[in-house]
Amino acid sequence: AEFFGGGLTIRATVDPDLQAAAAAALREGLEKFDRAGGVWRGTGKVIAADRLGEGAGWRAALAEVAVPRDIAGWHPAVVLATTGKAARIGIEGVEDDPDGHFIPAEDVSWARKRLADGKLGAKAKGAGDLVEVGDVVLVRAITNDDGSFKRWSLRQVPEVQGAFMAMDVNSGRVLAMQGGFSYQDSVFNRTTQATRQPGSSFKPFVYAAALDSGFSPATIIIDAPIEVNTPQGMWRPKNASNKFYGPAPMRTGIEQSRNLMTVRIAQEIGMDTVAIYAERFGVYDPMNPFLANALGAQETTLFKMVAAYSMFANGGERVEPTLVDRVQDRYGKTIYRHDQRVCEDCQLASLGAGFAPRIVSRRERVMDAITAYQLTSMLQGVVQRGTGRGIHLPVPFAGKTGTTNDSKDVWFIGYTSNIAAGCYIGHDQPRPMPHASGAGMCGPVFQAFMQAAVAKYGGGKFRVPPGGHFINVDRFTGSPLVDGSSGDNVVAEYFRDGEEPTFGMLVDGGFGMGSNLPLFAYGEVGSDEGDATVITGTGETKVIPGKANFGTLSSGGLY
């Protein structure tokens, strides 16, 4: 009774601008994939010919048809006639034009209609090849660069679905949540309800457990074939490239999403340890300690994954996502507030120039602050030169791609210093998505949303916790370099004070590495551009052998 009749004021966390940005970004990504498939399905709804009369006739009939009306810029319409290669349409909410509204031939050349025998017909040469009189369709206006009207365009709700979520990494406030292409088309919230394999986007939790178990980003891991005898038969995980690259630093393993390195790390530290971390971060409850789950085989939700990544971003403190910021009673008294952090200086009348209020947190620490920074640095490498290198933002950010077997599910989850966001795309009934990858499909969705988020909320450098120091390391070999070294292969790794790194130690997970294997030097992505050089702090030039070439994105996943 108090809830419904007590005059309570409930403040939601969702930012309307960012919610609109999330919906637009996800819809654009889903529609791009759907249209690339080139199959016209339409709405499947038809209005009888006797209800297509001029004036209010077709409008009344169209208003009764159940089609999505919550997609920004889209309008329900009905085909009134097909003339030549164009189709004349009546559009809900748009006044009649004396010359008529038309779908021109140029708008349908991307599509083919599925024939009665299940085969695809030829590419449409005119609108009449796709639609018939009485068909209910969805349309949107295409504009010129100056915003002027160009033409009406046929649209359809994609078969592929997805979800997107963004949250404040410090307060837990959910800033945006999009559970699918259209709520009116499907009320299923894929952010919270769809349990899917996260694939390689789970790997950071394996690496986090390793970093807390004595590993460093420069620890050398063997990338070579593995065979595991299981009750279901022999399991032979593979890299996405179907190649293996020999000894490489742990940083390379996550930047290039190496499955074999990840499995060896998980075997070395123990899957029980990995499970403890996954459960501590709320990804699973419980996690089954099987090696395949180190590659993201066990299902979870996007909601849980974004919440877990938020704890990487905030330095390792527990944060719970919420859609309710606070609740006030009828007198304006706050009776519930989600964010329990304390502002030490908010009662002061003023602060000195350059000072900000101190926010004190007493939250549980789920991860060592130095481990969180090391992992963030490695995930920055993913977007700088790894599987997510096609994503660009004007502020520092980190993230991880995920692509499962046969590209049935694709992910990208990333974060700036203040906002974490994640994208998932896949069919509700899992099936392969040809040529799909987390970077290629979810990457652009993440980028489009985060550009809007950064424009509104900004972003800065990730905070370096006290208690450590930087050492320049050759990211190809894991070898230490002198201070002042420069070059494409130089990376500054952060190590704990008093725990000097051990360089040159090989980790194989107990699997070993066979002899006479066709290994690729340093396992880098890209063309063989010849030798690379490094200028050391003493002015010496060190030659690094050319990179191996193994083609396009290595998104990792379940192989």
Residue ranges of each PLM-predicted region?
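Periplasmic/cell-envelope proteins involved in peptidoglycan metabolism and beta-lactam response
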Residues: 3-196, 200-202, 208, 215-219, ...
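Glycine-rich, acidic and aromatic/proline-enriched surface loops and short helix-turn segments
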Residues: 166-181, 211-215, 226, 246, ...
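Acidic/polar loop patches that form or flank catalytic/metal-binding clefts of enzymes
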Residues: 35, 216-223, 287, 318-323, ...
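Active-site loop and adjoining helix of the penicillin-binding protein/serine DD-peptidase-beta-lactamase fold
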Residues: 6-14, 123-129, 157, 164, ...
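Soluble, non-transmembrane domains of envelope/secretory-pathway proteins that act on or interact
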Residues: 48-57, 81-85, 92-95, 133, ...
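Active-site-proximal alpha-helical segments within enzyme catalytic domains
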Residues: 16-31, 85, 170-173, 204-212, ...
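Active-site-proximal helix/loop microenvironment
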Residues: 14-15, 280-346, 354, 360, ...
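Conserved catalytic neighborhood of penicillin-recognizing serine enzymes
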Residues: 170, 215-274, 318, 330-373, ...
